Every structure is written in structure tokens, then in C-alpha cells.
Amino acid sequence: MTSTSPKSRRSSGKGRKGSKKKGKQVSQIPPLSKTPPSFRNRIVDKKALKQLVAWAYKNHGTAVTAAMADNLKDLGFKYATQAAVSISVDDLKVPDAKQDLLGEAEQQITATEECYRLGEITEVERHTKVIDTWTETNERLVDAVKKNFNQNDPLNSVWMMANSGARGNMSQVRQLVGMRGLMANPQGEIIDLPIRTNFREGLTVTEYVISSYGARKGLVDTALRTADSGYLTRRLVDVAQDVIVREEDCGTSRAILVKAEDGRFGNRLVGRLTAEQIVGDADEIIAKKDTAIDPELSKKIEKAGLAGIMVRSPLTCEATRSVCRKCYGWALAHNNLVDLGEAVGIIAAQSIGEPGTQLTMRTFHTGGVSTAETGVVRSTIAGKVEFGPNARVRGYRTPHGVEAQQAEVDFTLKVKPTGSGKTQTIEISNGSLIFVDNAQEIAADVTVAQITAGAVKKSVEKATKDVICDLAGQVRYESVIQPREVTDRQGNITLKAQRLGRLWVLAGDVYNLPPNARPVVKANSKVSKGMVLAEASQASEFGGEVRLRDSIGDSREVQIVTTSMTLKDFKLLEESTHTGEIWNLEAKDGTRYRLNSIPGSKISSGEIVAELADDRFRTKTGGLVKYAPGLAIKKARSAKNGFEVSNGGTLIWVPQETHEINKDISLLMIKDRQWIEAGTEVVKDIFSQTAGIVTVTQKNDILREIIVRSGEFHLCNESKVLERFEDEGQMVNPGENIAKGLKADSMVLVQTVESRDGKGLLLRPVEEYTIPDQAQLPELSHVKQEKGPSLGLRATQRLAFKDGELIKSVEGVELLKTQLILDTFETTPQMTVDVEVALDKRAKTINRLRLVILESILVRRDTMSDSSHGSTHTELQIKDNQLVNADDVVATTQILCKEDGIVQLPNAVDDEPIRRLIVERAQDTTVLTAKDNPILKVGERVVDGDLLSKGEPINCCGEVEDIKGNKVTLRLGRPYMVSPDSVLHVRDGDLVQRGDGLALLVFERQKTGDIVQGLPRIEELLEARRPRESAILCKKPGIVEIKQEEDDESVVVKVIESDDSLSEYSILLGRNVMVSDGQEVHAGEFLTDGPVNPHELLECFFGDLRDRKPLLEAAQESIAKLQHRLVTEVQNVYKSQGVSIDDKHIEVIVRQMTSKVRIEDAGDTTLLPGELIEIRQVEDTNQAISVTGGAPAEFTPVLLGITKASLNTDSFISAASFQETTRVLTEAAIEGKSDWLRGLKENVIIGRLIPAGTGFSGFVEELRAEAGPHPDILAEDPAGYRRMQNLRPDYTVEMPVSTAAKSTSVLDDPSEEDLEATRSRHGIDPTTSNFAAFARPSGDDPSQEDQKPDPIALEGLQEEGLLADE
């Protein structure tokens, strides 16, 4: 293929070829230059095509480019058809080198596993090494794939596709023909089992499952990402929608510096305008001020070798509430200066939001630090190592567990050849690792050192990993570990290793003992199979009668009756009813009790056992209850169970029938206050049971209730008598006179009642019930142990209703209940009482009720060979119905030995029972025979490869127990390496089972890509979130001094500032200090690692600059520093995912986030402290106030997240349509805000033309018309008025806003007295006239804009010489 270089401005031959083919389509193409195109021979891939199309577009416009692109497409298809490019499974060629590479990796991993088995490296180091080995193998395999295709099949369709950029990339090809590689589990941790096969060879089932972990995560991710990204775009649009290009040039002198990266600017300068003249080496002017930088100029600047260029940027633009054309630069759509009225804010928002879907949401955790082989230096010759004279090294252990040395200073290392040859010199920098010792003889191609570029402190975090035991046995520490007890803040004691060392687990058979078992064998005694090792017994607490129950599952219940109580005078009878079984107790005199708790149930103290079934206290209807004097009840907390009688007496009952109806009034069949007979139908289907006077209650034509009061009715017209018995009436005793000719025969309740015939007296019958002082208690018989609980019953009488209570009912009610209640003494809360049926001892046909307290003991059955418990053998020591005393043994359990061996007991800790013991069996030891005298000592621990005698290695690990002649007895064991500061879960001499945790390794791993990546990170930046544990930042510049505290846990970093003052920063546990002693630091520099808090960073910058510069400059500079930082951070996230966004888009958004300041002190302005206001407005206000000599407002810059910034815009319509609608609108209403409809959103909501694009010019005209005589309205908020209002009302001044505006007469600063005198002399009322009103209208109300100053007042001022004659 041939191509025209994008540099060449002549047309390519292809364009011509196409134009012949499609004459019609290309006829509008302007004639191209006649010079023959230069011939270039190079491969055109995706990138070159892009450049070609871009070149055509730039030089020849859209039509030509479209035609050319079409022709290119035809060309591509034509040749692809001729070449018959296709793709098939056979094109996926697996490189032959794959097997060897995998083999090598396997070998390395086997070696690593072996090191781990011998306790040379820790679990963490093993994991890290395995993962790194596979990562490296994968990389090498990718290279092999590339090499294979390049050499053997360069025209392979898969290779061409990936290589040209048409589809796919190397990482995908790698999975097709290399290996799929390492996968992460759902928690994001890398599984150390990689997928060795590729899709061409096919995956095994295990590999397939592991592989689909990641795939599923990807799918879920994509779904969430779309939503998140959409919301991000919405917030961005909201914050930037009112940024429109409104001015040609804001005339600012501020700019930003764009620095070259590795001497190159790339595309970062293209489309910007220079802020100053650019001068090259020989004072040649490369570009004048305000020149647009195109790619050619950008290359020129690069060639001139300039490190940085000052360019104009939206960040520094001083146009109010918009950006000007020159600060924005090119519109990237057509590579020309942006047009006026272009809505650049929305373009910026969409450019940042749209790629959001392409970012990952993943948060990664790798298992350990991934140290790629960076800067590894190998020896080129065989020779002797020599360190330079100033060399200082310290021991260091790499993350892979390799012992090495770390350089503390920069020095030179030489390898002097043993034979002939040139000396190899290696420059070692501070912090580099050296894998050889001084004066060591080494061979060629040995790894000598790993050079790090400077002492870069990486950001690390603490992580932990468990060490799990692989065999049962006894733990032994190596003395090196030096465990120490650490007490944390909660007072918990943990054991920590101080040094790197091994924990040994020496093999043996570990028996777990049941909770109350005790060993019956002595330490170090011999035991044989079937011997009893330990014994546990179960005893009765109180004693009593034994009952054996049938066994359930693998255990058997033994019940011991400690206490029982029988009701011996009552027969227990069972009745069947339609609701179920009912049990009754019947006494000899025929009184019956209903049993509340049926046999077989459990009850506790205070529960009701039975209730007297008694009809003596049952009424026929509802009525009124009255207590006669003498009847008393106990006070109770709740009346749920009625009122307990304390003193007996008489209960008086007045019957009254109440029908609760709730039906329509039309169904009523009688009249109110009518006398009716018993059996009368009062409402349809409801009949009265007694005769008497009816009272009907109704509400809203709904019948509520009908009351029938029975008795004799006598008409009466004596008012005194009627008054006496009004309301509730009175009780009248027999023989007492009620009225003339009316005497009571029996006790009655007399009430005054109105009937249909007139007023009269109703004599209501009364029933009396006598209540005894105490209820009768049945006879009981007890069986009780000496110590232990006892039972009792008590009888109580309870009244259901209180004095004066009215019971609304048709059916009768029970007034008094007699209950039997259970009482227990000296019981524990968990003891329950069982209800049982017992046969009478004499008459076997009669059942009696018995209440018993049982002690239940569960006895385990024999478990023949449960691996951890050994064989257990359980025996019951009692028989059924036997009587046992307190503390008698009920059952014993013996733990039997499974194999012959020697018993060892663990170290006894004070008073703690022994829970495990160990038997050392024959298979736990091995006898080695040495050819020569053994060179080992008893008690020494050895691993594979150690020498038994001279030249005779051992092939197992363990501890030497005995040496007889040349026979060595070795107890097998397994070492585990623990790193310093690991938490030990076991103590020396403890016994462990397989699978127990031995220790928790604490290690540091690199924070991978700050863990938060992609969308969440972008959101964190743009919302200016405060991270949870942010880095500690330096507040003022100075020299660092690091001091370790006594308790060795925390570090204090001191910074000695220029004025010799000290700032102390205490650093918490687990944070890494990122500075070194004596280092010079600047404000805002990191003292520890961790995510940065942008708000704190701004404070640091501002605090530092505030001391050295004027307020406004300090604010602008600190904001500029922060802006630069934010833009870079956002760019980094997108770049890491391969998305390119032009800086200016991010700048537009960041500008909106940093445009406000917070007023701290209002000075003489009318601003409010705490108010958020644009920095430009404060600047203008302060400038105005300074003319009059007033105190300016003090402020601090603030950073607002995009949501906050959207809610803080001047337009309340825009803010309300975004979030918190009610709050925003209420506040706006209370403050009486006006919305000036500047942005797009407000206008869209109201339905006006938007002030962008074609509507822009109309918008400017409209504003001018609105402004009337004050063209100022275009310049500022509610115009310059806002600035005028910010002054105290006693000053009048107007700042020249633009050169066009004539400067107005300026007041000197008159004193209060001067003003007062002037007012009085000219008869000005101080309440109506305000001097400041002469220079400004008094509000944002346009109707007041034409307000003219008061002519009398003006004259007065001129006469006083306080105002110039103009």
C-alpha cells in the first residue's frame, strides 16, 4: 500500500482513482494542484489512516474528505476480496515455545513450594512469588506469540487484525493463542491458580469456572456503569450549562503553564493561544502573543526544546460567568477559533461524561506486592565483587523471601574478572537491592542488583494472611522469634513475633478432651491401644429418683425427680368436647376446677394451674358492679388478670341489658324511653331478655346501643324526690320510704327516669354476692430433697371488674374467679415444672395430678472412633427408679487410646483445665542410620538438606530426640516461617489439630493504582469528596525532623519553618511517613501516604501564600495550583484507561468548581460572613471600597463539588430543577431573588430562546434593551448595582467599569457630622433620602432604574463643596 504522508499537502493518488470511478459524486471537488504526488512506501495502519483523513479534512474540507474516505473503503474491500482474507480456527497458531515456558514456570513454583515446606519463606512470600512467576511467564508468552507470528506467518489474519488496529489487541490475542492467565475471584483477589490453556486449546472444567468469575463481574460492572456514567453526565451538564462563549477577549494577563513530558507536548498545545511571545534559543521569535498553536507550531516549539509554555486557558479567563474566545482557543470540531455563543460548558460536560461507560469500576486487590523485575543488573563476567569504599548496606528481605542487602547510600560496585577481561562497574543508587556480598566470587550471568530510580517511597497498606496448620501435633517456637505480649487499647493481649523465625509443629496424635474430662495418665508415660487416657464424669446436682428415658439420636437422657407435689384429694378427669380434650379436677364435695395446664406441659412459678368452675358468681346479663363497704382488693400493676381480693365482703350487682347495634336507625322497632316487656323485638332479629325502660343511643342516624333497665316504674311529680334520685340514683334498704306511699320491700337502686308518660322513679332490683375472705386450698402431699427447690400452691380469688364499672353485655359474665397458682422456692430461672398424671397408690383406677421438678442429664453414647476425640466409652452408673443423693455420679465417659505410643501433656496454664493431649506414635518418628558419626545434637531441629554426618544429607524435617551410636531418632515435624510483627495464635507447647490457625502474618503490599479507579475515582475528584483516611499534608514549608515516640508505636514529624517556628504532626499507627529526616518540604506536600483531601490541600496552599502575598493574589495562586492538580488527576484516570480527552473540557468544569470564595469578614462592605460569592465580585467590591478608604472584605477560596456548585448557582430555576427543589425554591422566595435567565437551562424551562448559538446575538440585544441607561448590566451580576450595594450606604462612589463609561464625580469621605449638617441645612429628611441613592438605584427592580437623584440634595451638596460642580 502506498500513502501520502499526512505532512504532505498534496492529494493522494487514491483520491484520483476514486474520482474517476465515481465521477458524479466527486464533481464538486475543487481542482487540486497539478504537481505529481510524491511516492511514499509505508504500511498504513489505523493511526496513519486517522492522520490521512484528518489532513484531508483540514486542507480540503468535508466534501473531499467524505469522498476520499469512501474511496479508501472501496479500496480496502477490493483488496481484501482479492486477497481472500478470512479467519478460521486454524489461524490461531499456538507458539511452540509455550510448553517450555510453562515447564520453566512449573519448576520455579515447585522450588518455591519446597522453600515454603522447609519453612524458608512465609505463606505471603510464597503467594507473591507464585503470582509474580505466572505474570512474568504470561508476558514472556506474549512475546513468544508476537515472535511466532512475525517470523512464521506475518500475513496471518488474526495477527493482521490485531496489529493494524482493525479489531482486538494483544491481550485478546494472548488469550486466544497464549494462555488465559491469572484470574481474580469475586472479591477481586488474584487466585494463584492460573488458566494455563488458551481458548484454542480449550479450558478444563476448573479453569472454565475460574474464568467465568471474572466474566460475570464484567457483566454486572457494565450494567452499573451505564447508570453511574449517565448520572455523572447529568451533574456535569448542570454545573457547566451556563458557560457560553460571550466575549471576544477578556484581556487577562494570567495564564497557565503547560510543561513538556519527556521533551514532548503531544496534542496538549494544539488549539491553545499563546499568552506571551515565545522565544527560541537564538532569540528568534517562534510565535507572537495570542497566536493559535497548530500541530506544526507545536512541533516547532518541541524542536526549540522549550520546557514549558504559558498558554491561555478557561481556568484563568476573566470573563464574567463565561469564557472568552481567546482563552478557550480552538473549537475542536473544526480546528478554528471558537464562535461567540458556543455552549462550551455542555460540550465539556458531554466530553467528560460520555467516555464514563468505557472506564472500569473495578477496584483491584493483588495478593501482595507485585515487584516486576525492574532495573535488574546481571554480571557480564565471572569475577570477584568489590563494594566501593563509602558503601553502607543493611540486611533486607525481598517480597519473595530472598535475603538481600539494601543500599543506604549511592556507591559503585565493581566485578573484577578472575581471568582476562574488562572490569564491570555498576552504579548502585540509594534504596537499591544487592544480591551478592562484598568479596564474593560469582559466575557470569548472575543477578547482582536491582536498581531503583531514587529512593521512591511507595504507597503501601497493611494486609494480613493466615497460616493454617497442615498436621496435628505440638507447637514449638524457635528462640529467634522472641514473642512478646502486646496489650491493645481494649486491654486484649496478643502475642506478636519480634523477629523472623520458624514455628515448628511436631507430629503426634492429638486427642480433644470433653469439657469436664481430666487425664488419668502421667506425662511421658507409655500407653497401649485401648488404655484409658482421660475420664469424665457426670453427677446429679440435687439427687432424687432416677428415670431413664429412651435414647434420642446418639445421646440418652437421664431424668432425676428432685421435688414432686401431688393433689391427693382431687380426681383428675378427662372430658372430650368438640374443641378437644378438657381436664378437670373434682373434689369430694363435687366442686370442680378446670385445669389450665394440661399434663405433659411445662409451667413456671406464678402460672395458673387450675381455675374453679363455679356458677354461683355468674350473672344473666350485663350490669353495674358496686363493692359494699369492707370488700377490699390488692393494688396491682395491671388489671389484665383482674383484681385479687384481700378482704372478703359483699358485691352488689344491678342487672342491665345492653345491646350494641351499629345499624341504621330505620331498623329500630320500638321508641326511646318506652316501657317494654321481656321478649320484645327491639331491632330486627334482636330481642330483649328482660322487661324495663328502653334508652336508645344514636349518632348521625346510626343506632349505637339499646339499654334495657328492668324494675318497677312509678310516675312521680315531686321535684324534691326526683332531684334526690337523679343521675346514678341511690341504694335504698328494705323498709325505707322512697316517696309518699312508696316503700322498698327489698334492697333496690332508685333512679329518676323519663318515660314517654312523664318523669318517674325506677326501682331497680339488686343482687348481692358474698365473697369469702380466703379461697379453699386442696390438700397436697410433697416429696423433697434436702437441698434443692421446693413447690407450693396458693389459692387466690380475683374479681373481674372494679368498683362502679358498667359491663355492657347481653350475655352474663363471671364476677369472681378462684385460681390455683404455682409457687416455687429456691429454683433457678431455667428450671421448669412438669405437669404429670399419676395413679393413686391405693386405688389404681383413680388419676391424680402431680407437679414435678426434674434434673435432666444428657449422656453421650459410645462413639467408636471419632478421629479427634479418640474412642470414647460411656457407662451409666445408675438404674431406673433408683434414689441417688446430691453429687452422685450418674455416668462416666472414658477416652481410650487408639494406638501405642508415648503420652505428652501440654504446658499447664494456671488453673485452666487440660483440653487436649497428644500421643507420639511410632509413625511420628523415624530412625536414621548414619555412615559416620552423626554431627547432630539432641533437641536440634533439622530440615531437608541438612547434614546427618559429613556429606550425608537428611531427607526429612523434624527434631532430634535421641542419638545412640550412629542411629538418630528424629521426631517428624513441619516448620512454618513467620515474619516480624505477626500475630501468634498459639503458644509454645500448645497442641494443634490439622486446620487450626497458627499465626496471622502482617505484611505490606503496594496500594495498587490507589485501588479506587475508573468512574468512582472520577466521581470522587469532581465531587471533591473528603477521603476517609486522607494523607497528612504539610501546612508551611520548612525542614523535616522525624522523632520516634517512646512507646515505639507512633511517629512525630516536626517541620522547622523559615521563622524557626515548629509545626508538629503526629502520625497514627499504620501510616507510612513519606519524607525523610532533614528533607525540605513545601506547603501541601505529603507527609504520609494516603489519598489527598482536596479541601485540605487548598487550605495548605492558601495558608502558605497568605503570609507572603496580598489576599487576592494568594487566593488566585492557591486556586490555580489546585486547579492544575485536579485537571492532572482527572486526566490520569482517563489516560490509564486509554481515553483521551482534551484538557480544556476538564478545565471548564474545574473552573466552575473553583470560582467561588467564602467571605470570612465583611469589612465595610454589605456582604455577609459565610456567603459564597464569585471571586470577581469580591474583587470589584473591594476595589470600590478601597477608593473610599473603607475596610475590604476578607475571604478564603473554596472548592465545591459539582453537585454543590450546581446548587450554588445564581440561577435558582436551574438549581431547583437539579436537586432539592423545595429547599431551593423556598430559599429563593424568602430572599426575594430574581433569576436573570443567563444559562441555557433556565431559558429552556421557561420556554424562551436559549442564549447560545443563533439565539446568542438576540440575547445580547435584549440585555442591552433591558439595561436602558445602564449598559453596566452586561458586565456584572445584577449589573454594577450589586457592587454599589456592597458599600456601606454612607459612601457614594462608582467605579469605572469599562473605558467607555465616564467616571462619575467622587465623594471625599464625609464624616457623619458633615452629612448630618448638610441634611439639616437643606431640610433633607434622613429617613427618606439616602446619599448612596444618588449614585445607584436601590435594588434589582428594573422599574427603579430610572430613579434620578434628588435635585435639592444635589444642590446642597454642591454648595457645601462636597460634590464637584460637574
Curated annotation (Swiss-Prot):
Any GO BP: DNA-templated transcription
MF terms (GO), sorted A to Z: DNA binding; DNA-directed RNA polymerase activity; zinc ion binding
GO cellular component, one term: DNA-directed RNA polymerase complex
InterPro entries assigned: DNA-dir_RpoC2_beta_pp, DNA-dir_RpoC_beta_prime, RNA_pol_Rpb1_3, RNA_pol_Rpb1_3_sf, RNA_pol_Rpb1_4, RNA_pol_Rpb1_5, Rpb1_funnel_sf
Swiss-Prot/TrEMBL keywords: DNA-directed RNA polymerase, Metal-binding, Nucleotidyltransferase, Transcription, Transferase, Zinc
Compositionally skewed regions (Low complexity) per UniProt: 1353-1366
Protein name: DNA-directed RNA polymerase subunit beta'
Species this protein is from: Prochlorococcus marinus (strain MIT 9211)
